[in-house]
Amino acid sequence: MSISSALAMVFMGAKGNTAAQMSQALCFSKIGGEDGDIHRGFQSLLVAINRTDTEYVLRTANGLFGEKSYDFLTGFTDSCGKFYQATIKQLDFVNDTEKSTTRVNSWVADKTKGENILLFYFDNILNSFIVSSLQNCQI
């Protein structure tokens, strides 16, 4: 569930040949229906998994961390919130590596109740290439 919902969020932002290849690789094309059906399916599944009135404890969370100098399409960020309960957090990956790393890891630690700490570290060499980071965790 974890990796599939993260990849479905990436798929939501893909277009053209990239979207076609992702659809095929993720077997979304075999499910049938429109792309929105896939995202509505994940939305229903995430709501069911994160219910609090169950005997089991299973939680999943999606986070989208974007480079603050990059303009993300409003339709994409709105859809991430609607279907995957993920709001975008704008960070300065390029100029403030340490603070960005701390913010992402704090989010993960909060969502996993401290189970996964220091999952993510940005290397200074890669910072100029980072546009966004998508995080997904389950407890």
From Swiss-Prot:
GO terms for biological process: activation of immune response. Its main location: secreted. Keywords: Glycoprotein, Protease inhibitor, Secreted, Serine protease inhibitor, Signal. Gene3D superfamilies: Antithrombin, subunit I, domain 2 (3.30.497.10). Highly expressed in dendritic cells and primary leukemia cells, especially those of myeloid lineage. It comes from the Eukaryota. GO terms for molecular function: serine-type endopeptidase inhibitor activity. One of its GO terms (cellular component) is extracellular space. Glycans are attached at residue 50. InterPro entries: Serpin_dom, Serpin_fam, Serpin_sf, Serpin_sf_1. It is found in: Secreted. Transmembrane segments: none annotated. Residues 1-20 form the signal peptide. The keyword Signal applies. Putative serine protease inhibitor. PANTHER family: SERINE PROTEASE INHIBITOR, SERPIN, SERPIN B6. Belongs to the serpin family. This is Serpin-like protein HMSD. It comes from Homo sapiens (Human). The lineage of its organism: Eukaryota, Metazoa, Chordata, Craniata, Vertebrata. The gene is HMSD.
